[in-house]
């Protein structure tokens, strides 16, 4: 017989998992209608939380941990805000940690969160799954990976399919006449760094563009490496005419050095960033981006963690990405025809 979980109760009651969790935990921040519907669903499904979940509730801290890769990264700042608000609505406070893209700092924060006996942890993991990441598994602490994963670990996750957005970006630049596209990659110690680099390599090959390895600079998802990457790429004997930065902070670094060098973005050189930060659209010129919903990612991560805390085994979720064309990837050459893309 298939075990009934809180996700089933929420679906039958027509409420979110967070609302069902609040009702079942006795949180007063619920409406009479929601309480009635959840109670009816519990009765109809004969829902009985498993022993592990009951034990967790009897000693719970009403807190969760969130460990992000770099709090300076606008993407992770937005993610933290969404997670904090969604968790609070479900009756949990969020303890935030910053790994600063360093494994030893990641381990220190995870050890601290474990010692604080949080009810579950959402983490954007770095590394190969050793150290404190492994401790989460051996101690059976409810865990959800967000944005990134670790190869070989069966942890529920919510991530982004980078393939479509990167393919659209390369096609857009190729259609505009660019044949040498510089790529500022994320670190290969992260799943996103590896996946996005692989997607870029496939897209370049499919478009028949130059696969010169010198056109790739491996950064570390921090602004300084974005600046260093642009500087290195522009020193090539045949420099690129377009750039694709694999995340928002490296894009910020790229913008800074291009301004310093007097290179006009959108006129002298095209630039596209992975991640759509709100103020990217306000720049002059507005920045073309590969967009994916950080708000949806955060909400889903919290819902998944609540299911794991309840003893459930949610399926991992992969969100889509898409190119948003703005002025930063305009070009003086006449673009070839291609599929229509979202503009904003």
Model-derived features: where do they sit?
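N-terminal helix-turn-helix DNA-binding module of bacterial transcription factors
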Residues: 1-62, 330-333, 339-344
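Short acidic/polar active-site loop segments enriched in Thr and Asp
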Residues: 16, 62, 119, 178-180, ...
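Short beta-strand segments enriched in small/hydrophobic residues
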Residues: 17-21, 56-72, 172, 180-187
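Bacterial carbohydrate/catabolite-sensing allosteric modules
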Residues: 44, 82-90, 114, 138-145, ...
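Amphipathic helical "hinge" segments at domain boundaries
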Residues: 47-112, 116-120, 198-201, 205
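Short hydrophobic/charged patches on amphipathic alpha-helices used for structural packing
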Residues: 53, 107-110, 133, 170, ...
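Short beta->alpha connector loops
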Residues: 100-103, 124-129, 249
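Acidic, Gly/Pro-rich loop/turn segments at junctions of secondary structure
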Residues: 122-133, 145-155
């Amino acid at each position: 017989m298939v075990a009934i979980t809180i996700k089933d109760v929420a679906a039958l009651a027509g409420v979110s998992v967070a609302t069902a969790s609040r009702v079942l935990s006795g949180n007063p921040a619920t409406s009479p209608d929601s309480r009635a519907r959840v109670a009816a669903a519990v009765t109809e499904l004969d829902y009985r939380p498993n022993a592990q979940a009951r034990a967790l509730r009897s000693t719970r801290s009403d807190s969760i941990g969130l460990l992000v890769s770099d709090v300076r990264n606008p993407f992770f700042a937005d993610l933290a805000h969404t997670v904090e608000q969604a968790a609070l609505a479900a009756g949990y406070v969020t303890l935030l940690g910053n790994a600063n893209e360093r494994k030893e700092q990641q381990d220190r924060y995870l050890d601290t969160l474990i010692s604080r006996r949080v009810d579950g942890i959402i983490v954007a993991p770095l590394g190969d799954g050793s150290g404190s990441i492994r401790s989460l598994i051996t101690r059976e602490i409810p865990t959800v990976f967000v944005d990134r994963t670790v190869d070989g670990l069966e942890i529920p996750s919510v991530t982004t399919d980078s393939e479509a957005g990167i393919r659209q970006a390369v096609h857009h630049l190729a259609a505009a006449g660019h044949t040498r596209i510089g790529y500022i990659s994320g670190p290969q110690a992260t799943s996103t760094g590896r996946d996005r680099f692989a997607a870029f390599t496939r897209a370049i090959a499919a478009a028949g563009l130059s696969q010169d390895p010198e056109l790739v600079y491996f950064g570390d998802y921090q602004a300084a490496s974005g600046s260093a990457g642009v500087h290195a790429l522009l020193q090539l004997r045949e420099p690129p005419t377009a750039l694709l930065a694999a995340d928002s902070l490296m894009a910020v670094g790229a913008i800074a050095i291009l301004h310093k060098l007097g290179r006009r973005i959108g006129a002298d050189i095209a630039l596209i960033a992975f991640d759509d930060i709100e103020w990217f659209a306000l720049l002059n010129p507005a920045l073309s981006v590969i967009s994916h919903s950080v708000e949806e990612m955060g909400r889903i991560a919290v819902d998944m963690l609540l299911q794991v805390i309840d003893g459930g085994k949610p399926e991992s979720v992969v969100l889509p990405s898409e190119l948003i064309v703005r002025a930063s990837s305009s070009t003086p050459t006449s673009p070839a025809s291609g599929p229509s893309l979202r503009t904003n």
